[in-house]
């Protein structure tokens, strides 16, 4: 079994004051830098379909309404190397046309260049999923790739 698309092609991160976030077709990843030596019991993390909240040692780091809905039961968080919290959210709408422009409705928006790169990456990931025999991890894309690229579903095979 080959590695996931994002492992082969890299990710397009959106930097924030507390770390970064990035997305794939199916998931949104949030990486929060916390003080070294942080213990799991120091972390309070609430994940709901449209809301996320994270506090470390009683200090609120992240809280708000998500850009779009997620599957609450599939959201997870982990503490890695006692210095980073990784939150993984599963998107409700899992297609290339659903490229989040920001993490929260009013905060942590990707700048126009990062947004463009995210849309390109999701479109390539879509092509990879539709054509598993090809490797699009090193491919470049230009032209019509916004909203997931062209729709070929009605073409005859």
From Swiss-Prot:
SUPFAM superfamilies: HSP20-like chaperones (SSF49764). The keyword Phosphoprotein applies. The modification Phosphotyrosine is found at residue 145. The modification N-acetylserine is found at residue 2. Pfam families: CS (PF04969). Residues 14-104 form the CS domain. InterPro entries: CS_dom, HSP20-like_chaperone, NudC_fam, p23_NUDCD2. One of its GO terms (cellular component) is kinetochore. Keywords: Acetylation, Centromere, Chromosome, Cytoplasm, Cytoskeleton, Kinetochore, Phosphoprotein. It is found in: Chromosome, Centromere, Kinetochore; Cytoplasm, Cytoskeleton, Microtubule organizing center, Centrosome; Cytoplasm, Cytoskeleton, Spindle pole. Residues 134-157 are annotated as: Disordered. The modification Phosphoserine is found at residue 142. The keyword Transferase does not apply. May regulate the LIS1/dynein pathway by stabilizing LIS1 with Hsp90 chaperone. Interacts with LIS1. PANTHER family: NUCLEAR MOVEMENT PROTEIN NUDC, NUDC DOMAIN-CONTAINING PROTEIN 2. This is NudC domain-containing protein 2.
